[in-house]
Amino acid sequence: MAKASSTLVLSIIFLVMFALVEQNMGCTATMGPCEKDKSCSATCRATFGDRANGFCDYSTSTSPGGECTCVYHCPPVVPHESHL
């Protein structure tokens, strides 16, 4: 019986942890072509703030260097006022 109750408690803890995790994993934007073996994090940080990161994505680009992709925290959603 102790094993069954501990399994139930662990399951509940696991579900609560997932319920408390923030769902927003961030936003992405492409900033144009980037040179091979160069980081584009500086461009991303200048555009989206200090917490942004950038990388060259070679899988979607038609240019030889790749496409600069930025990952940054999404701005908060502002609710619209109702016009009723």
Curated annotation (Swiss-Prot):
Cleavable signal peptide: 1-23
Single GO biological process annotation from the record: killing of cells of another organism
Keyword DNA-binding among record annotations: no
Subcellular location: Secreted
Location (main, coarse): secreted
Residue runs in coiled coils: none
Any one annotated GO CC term: extracellular region
Cysteines paired by S-S bonds: C27-C74, C34-C56, C40-C68, C44-C70
Pfam families: AtDEF-like
Keywords, alphabetical: Antimicrobial, Disulfide bond, Fungicide, Plant defense, Secreted, Signal
Listed PANTHER family: DEFENSIN-LIKE PROTEIN 172, DEFENSIN-LIKE PROTEIN 183
Family: Belongs to the DEFL family.
Protein name: Defensin-like protein 172
